[in-house]
């Protein structure tokens, strides 16, 4: 990776040339700000350049952009099982953050480089002549992008805001970084201050981006932040910051802007690869000329023939959490992954749109998240318990097979919150929320051993090598060996199937809440270069 990019140059903020892909950029360190910001089109290109970096930066194929952060966060949670292959071992074993692994360091640059882009836009755009509404839109998107990035930092580099609002988090930069600042650095702010900055930026974006701004119907434009997206980000960030009234208000508004649309069963089972899906609020679409972010599907798609690493599999205990008539349950089945032929509970939720051309869109926000945010916020607000229950049931009903209805929700208080958190795990599985939810709710990773003998279909490949595949019943569930099966019977007719392989923290201690192994960690380079880092707030005791 390049320099730690709160850093020295105008570099990636600068020369973006729009060619085959709207996000194509050609960074240079030699361009001065007055040359870059001579018109609104160039300012807009700087924002597009920031998003290019967010989606495409990384150090290896196992750390490509924001999609890799989302994969990391789910591997570090309770419900994704990593099978043997390249990539994300440290994420699954929970050594990435505390041990300063690859994803940990990539995240730092992935966030602070674009923040510097946004700061440059905000410093210079008022001096550019042009249409005021267009200027407001670009300025609003710069604020919203920066707010989104500070939300990412606040939710990954510190424990929950209510655990210790004054705990150290990360530095806040709101001006372009010059040489002096890059070589000295700013003190790290507290987690509450970082959330405050995120919300302030997002509110500016909310106020400035015109409500009638239309990013168009092209899939490749769906990453652009419009009024719906910034409203959703206000809801998400308010939830993380435990501002329940705001979370409720903005989630409700976002739902209405999308007509409360929830996917049909057919749409839900279509592969989560299309940014034009009517429930999606925000997504990134790859093209033939810009498909690097879709490389992440080589991990997440475990079933398409010709797949790559196929290691993003499912905890068998997780499937048991679904109602028998919940169609989401159908997305998790035992089988042999297509990359390595390893037996696992595969996921059918994420599929390449076109594996031959490495195409598939990245989901970043959809309406069901807004339902869950509104329900969780309502559960915290006086007099809104029944509304929280109704919202939870409405979402569950939308995920039931035709002709079936979910049970009435009767839980209240903490039990209702637990049901909502569980529904987040079920509905948003694989979409990058696991680790953040564990941190912000002060919960623990929950992984249990799973090991059973299943009946096997036995075939042979062209070389005569035996292949055993778990037998499934008509409901897609594995057929287990008889309870009285002898060892000889199992050897002849069965196969051993298993779930999680990592069941404790790296130091062999049991999983618990508020562990140092959940957090991302300020990079060693930053600690060495930034002499002011801990001037205002002391280093977390877990690192001392």
Language-model segments: which ranges?
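Membrane-proximal, proline-rich intrinsically disordered regions
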Residues: 3, 20-70, 322, 403-404, ...
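Inward-facing hydrophobic residues that define packing positions of alpha-helical scaffold repeats
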Residues: 47, 115-118, 195, 202, ...
């Amino acid at each position: 990776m390049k320099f730690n990019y709160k850093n020295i140059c105008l570099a990636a903020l600068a020369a973006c040339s729009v060619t085959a892909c709207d996000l194509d950029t050609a960074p240079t360190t030699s361009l001065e700000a007055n040359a870059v910001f001579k018109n609104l089109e160039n300012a807009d290109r700087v924002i597009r350049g920031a998003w290019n970096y967010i989606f495409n930066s990384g150090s290896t194929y196992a750390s490509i952009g924001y999609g890799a952060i989302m994969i990391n966060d789910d591997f570090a949670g309770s419900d994704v099982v990593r099978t043997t292959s390249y990539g994300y071992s440290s994420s699954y074993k929970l050594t990435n953050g505390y041990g300063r692994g690859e994803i940990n360091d990539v995240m730092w640059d992935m966030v602070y480089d674009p923040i510097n882009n946004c700061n440059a836009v905000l410093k210079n755009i008022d001096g550019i002549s042009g249409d005021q509404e267009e200027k407001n839109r670009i300025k609003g998107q710069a604020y919203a992008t920066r707010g989104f990035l500070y939300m990412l930092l606040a939710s990954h580099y510190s424990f929950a805001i209510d655990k210790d609002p004054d705990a150290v988090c990360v530095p806040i930069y709101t001006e372009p970084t010059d040489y002096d600042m890059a070589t000295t650095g700013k003190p790290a702010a507290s987690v509450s201050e970082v959330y405050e900055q995120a919300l302030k930026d997002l509110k500016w974006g909310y106020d400035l981006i015109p409500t009638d701004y239309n990013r168009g119907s092209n899939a490749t434009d769906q990453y652009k932040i419009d009024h719906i997206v910034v409203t959703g980000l206000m809801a998400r960030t308010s939830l993380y910051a435990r501002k329940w009234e705001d979370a409720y208000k903005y989630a409700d508004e976002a739902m209405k802007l999308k007509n409360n649309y929830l996917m049909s069963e057919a749409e839900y089972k279509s592969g989560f690869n299309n940014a034009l899906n009517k429930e999606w609020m925000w997504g990134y679409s790859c093209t033939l000329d810009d498909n690097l972010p879709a490389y992440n599907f080589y991990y997440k798609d475990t079933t398409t023939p010709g797949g790559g690493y196929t290691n993003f599999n499912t905890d068998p205990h997780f499937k048991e959490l679904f109602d028998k008539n919940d169609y989401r349950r159908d997305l998790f089945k035992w089988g042999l992954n297509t990359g390595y032929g390893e037996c696992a509970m595969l996921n059918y939720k994420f599929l390449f749109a076109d594996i031959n051309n490495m195409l598939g869109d990245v989901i970043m926000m959809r309406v069901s998240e807004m339902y869950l945010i509104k329900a969780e916020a309502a559960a915290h607000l006086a007099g809104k318990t029944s509304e929280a229950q109704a919202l939870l049931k409405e979402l569950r009903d939308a995920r039931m097979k035709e002709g079936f209805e979910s049970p009435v929700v009767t839980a209240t208080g903490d039990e209702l919150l637990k049901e909502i958190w569980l529904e987040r795990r079920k509905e948003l599985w694989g979409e990058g929320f696991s680790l953040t939810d564990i941190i912000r709710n002060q919960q623990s990773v929950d992984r249990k051993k799973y090991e059973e003998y299943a009946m096997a279909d036995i075939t042979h490949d062209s070389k005569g090598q035996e292949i055993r595949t778990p037998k499934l019943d008509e409901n897609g569930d594995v057929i287990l060996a008889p309870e009285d099966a002898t060892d000889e019977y199992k050897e002849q007719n069965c196969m051993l199937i298993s779930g999680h392989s990592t069941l404790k923290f790296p130091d062999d201690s049991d999983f618990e809440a508020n562990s140092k192994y959940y957090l991302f960690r300020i990079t060693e380079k930053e600690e060495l270069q930034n002499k002011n880092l801990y001037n205002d707030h002391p280093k977390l005791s877990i690192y001392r």
